[in-house]
Amino acid sequence: DVKVLQAIAYALNKEEFCQFAFISEDYAEPADSLFTPDTLYYAKPDNTYDNDPAKAQQLLSEAGKTSLSLNLMYISTDKTMESEALYVQSALANVGITVNLVPTDESTFKNKTKDPECTDYDLVLSFYTLGEEPSLYADMCSSDSRSNYSRIKDTDLDALWEKGNSTADETERSDIYKEIQNTINDNMYIYTIAYSNGFYAVNKDFGGFDECLLKTIYYDYSKIYTLEK
């Protein structure tokens, strides 16, 4: 029920969430879209679901779901996920939703999330690194994808992904990907938590790291050079 998903979003506070899970804004900032800000055609969705527990309770009442119990699965060895799970459990309890934590080893986690028949979880914590090309994000949200952990079934959204990938006009592509981001957000298919920052240790004997494009996926090591002493 979309109202239940929206209620969950309103029950959470992203700033508080990030502080609880990542300790400091130096390590992560609240996310507002499936796309990261450096992804092509990133656009902040129209509805940001600002924290509103009263609105969350209203939506749950409208959906007839005032006494929910949900299973939240996450990787047991990931300390950030563990902190996130505890925050979700606490925040949703404030609006009357019981969250049962399901810590799982990484191998089992991968098997269960990729099994479309698995019913062991209602909510799942995950992370992704997909780079600047927006079409890559379709793998997380397409009806038939094995990486569709949220079990999204939306033929209109599937069509938008296909259209965005086959359209050459830049303006039209931008409009399509904005619609995709709004569709995911409006239906609260995926609640994006944070854009985490990457940190790198470098040797002072070398230079060129600024030109190396220090991103999680893309590097150009040819830009790195030895500094003369």
Please provide the spans of the model-predicted regions.
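Periplasmic-binding protein-like
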Residues: 1-38, 83, 183-192
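Soluble non-cytosolic domains of exported or imported proteins
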Residues: 2-3, 11-12, 47-54, 78-86, ...
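Extracytoplasmic/peripheral linker and loop segments enriched in polar/acidic and small residues
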Residues: 3-6, 18, 100-109, 137-204, ...
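Structural transition elements
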Residues: 10, 26-62, 78-81
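Solvent-exposed loop/turn segments at secondary-structure junctions
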Residues: 14-17, 26-28, 39-41, 76-80, ...
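Ligand/substrate-recognition segments at binding pockets and active sites
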Residues: 61-130
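Long beta-strand-rich cores associated with HINT superfamily self-processing modules
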Residues: 200-229
